[in-house]
Design a protein with these regions (language model features):
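ASCE RecA-like P-loop NTPase motor cores
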Residues: 1-164
């Protein structure tokens, strides 16, 4: 059975109708309890029914999602995360930068109905330091506390502030 035949069967199912009605009012849905293939089939049906692009945000499986969606005739972009650690220079390679720019440019232009983007949560988050590193490089001031100007100036200089 081809994916087209499976999608036609899904289109006739009551669950697809119920999810489609919920999507009209909720604007987004969270599918749980299905396999990746099941979620992909339902998502494909709903997006094709509404002629809308598809965005898949997952914890780690963006590449697998991209491959699955390609087999379902989507034009898929993989929005990859940067593999860097906090306080490491975020040197982005040209291929990743070009792919991200291409995805964003396509979204700014008129989006095509068969456009799908697969990404991870990490790729969408800004490059942030860990909580411990952030606290180590922070200065906490409380109302009513007093400090000498020299100590305050040296603490601010240690944090990277420059006297003007």
């Amino acid at each position: 059975m081809t994916f087209t035949a499976v999608l036609e069967n899904i289109a006739r199912s009551t669950i697809a109708t119920k999810i489609g009605e919920k999507l009209k009012t909720a604007k987004s849905i969270y599918l749980s309890g299905l396999s990746r293939l099941g979620k992909g089939l339902i998502s494909t049906h709903l997006c094709q029914q509404q002629t809308k692009p598809l965005l898949i945000v997952t914890v780690e499986e963006a590449t697998r999602w991209a491959l699955q969606l390609q087999s379902m005739s989507w034009r898929v972009y993989l929005y990859q995360p940067l593999d860097t650690f906090p306080y490491e220079s975020a040197q982005i390679d040209l291929e990743t930068a070009w792919t991200r720019i291409e995805i964003l440019a396509e979204l700014l232009a008129k989006p095509q109905p068969n456009l799908a983007i697969a990404t991870t949560i990490k790729a969408l988050q800004p490059h942030l330091p860990s909580t411990q590193a952030f606290q180590k490089h922070s200065l906490y001031l409380n109302i009513g506390d007093s400090q000498s100007v020299k100590l305050l100036a040296s603490a601010l200089a240690r944090l990277g502030y420059v006297e003007v």
